[in-house]
């Protein structure tokens, strides 16, 4: 997980969470514009950052935990605005559940309402995700080496 920061001269902290299947680069122009008014932290999940192709996305819960640790360490656990789009809303919901964080305003843009079950095994998660998202997940849903090999072939 990597954090890109803009507008550090501003006091209000906005954390932006991108959707699934895309990288943080899709939100970069918006983050730069918002940095004219806010201190923006744009999050790049493991497995979705082109600059870190060796990383693997584990779960929205893992990304939220790591983001929470980062915010507590660097900003005392306070987020003024938490913005998530699409699958980023899954991470957003997990961040909201973190008792160590204080979030003033939340924007959940395009939030899916499907529950993410607490499945312990990786195989079980793969089967669950395959049936709910189809073949696309099987091919592209494991960011990192598998996606890199697949994209190199097409």
Please give the residue ranges for each predicted region.
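Conserved alpha/beta-hydrolase catalytic His-Asp/Glu region
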Residues: 116-119, 135-154
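Active-site catalytic pocket residues across diverse enzymes, especially alpha/beta-hydrolases
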Residues: 34, 99-100
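Gly/Ala-rich beta-loop-alpha elbow adjacent to hydrolase catalytic centers
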Residues: 83-92
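Conserved HGGG/HGGXW glycine-rich cap/lid loop of the alpha/beta-hydrolase fold
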Residues: 4-52
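Structural signature of beta-strand start/N-cap positions in the alpha/beta core
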Residues: 13, 39, 79-81, 104
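Active-site loop/oxyanion-hole signature of alpha/beta-hydrolase fold enzymes
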Residues: 42-83
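Flexible "cap/lid" loop of the alpha/beta hydrolase fold
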Residues: 97, 103-135
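Active-site signature of alpha/beta-hydrolase-fold catalytic machinery across serine-
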Residues: 29, 94-98
């Amino acid at each position: 997980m990597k954090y890109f920061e803009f507008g550090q001269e501003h006091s209000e902290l906005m954390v932006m969470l991108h959707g699934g299947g895309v990288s943080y680069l899709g939100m970069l122009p918006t983050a730069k514009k918002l940095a004219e008014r806010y201190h923006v932290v744009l999050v790049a999940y493991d497995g979705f950052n082109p600059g870190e192709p060796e990383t693997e996305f584990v779960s929205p819960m893992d990304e939220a935990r790591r983001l929470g640790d980062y915010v507590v360490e660097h900003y005392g656990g306070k987020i003024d605005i938490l913005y998530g789009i699409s699958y980023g809303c899954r991470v957003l919901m997990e961040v909201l559940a973190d008792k160590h964080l204080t979030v003033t305003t939340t924007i959940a843009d395009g939030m899916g309402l499907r529950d993410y079950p607490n499945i312990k095994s990786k195989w079980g998660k793969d089967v669950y995700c395959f049936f709910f998202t189809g073949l696309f997940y099987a091919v592209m849903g494991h960011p990192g080496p598998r996606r890199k090999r697949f994209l190199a072939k097409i």
